[in-house]
Amino acid sequence: MQKLYVGCSGWSYDAWLGHFYPANLDRREFLKYYSQVFDFVEIDSSFYNAPNLFMIKRWASVTPDDFRFTAKFPRLITHEKRLSDPEKEFRYFFDVMRPLHHKVLALLLQLPPSLTAKEGLKKLRAMVHMLDSDFRYAIEVRHQSWFDKDVYKLLSDNNICLAWSQLDTIQTPPELTSDFLYLRFIGDRSIDEKDFGKVQKDRLKELKRWSDEVNRLKDDIKFAIIAANNHYAGFGPATANSFRKIVGLKEVQWEEMKQKGL
């Protein structure tokens, strides 16, 4: 493994003000500040609405050259159209993301829990030929029927990563289907957004278990992506730091930056 990227799912959280961000930091400066602390972020907002070119170009310009992103495909593709005839939406998303492609580690298809392999596998087979070769891809499934050898073969044949997801509703098997890993610490929706600035749950045992799985496959992958959601333990940056510590990476420091208002 050449590189382990550890960061958060999203960065635009007002609840982080005074905890991660300086209390008076302008929201327009959030990403620039975040990228001075972590070297990776998952773009969560693209799931709700595809970003526009202005936003993408700005994200590229305010982050360091070695900063990296992942981005979710819009829910229009996965949840509303349920993978049916996505070519038009794919083309738009790829065109929008292209100015950032040199910083994009992977694009993520997050499927809804109601989408079974029986309904979706045939659509997925047709869809893989529409994917732009400029990007790498990962897929997160939330129905047990997808954990099947035929699905794994399709993903492996196309170097599409089966994302490992720590959810309270389903357990993803640690299958390797690509030359990289994508691990997402998601949790549930029991933590209120106003409490996102502090840790609410002890998840260390789970973090350790998943770190062992990453370590098990380190010689088989080029890189690994670790994304920590606020809903997982209450404070994404702290979860990311805990994982870094477990795997032997130096913890990132934001307190000194925050006090200086950098």
Task: Place the predicted regions along the sequence by residue.
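Residues lining hydrophobic/aromatic ligand-binding pockets adjacent to catalytic sites
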Residues: 1-262
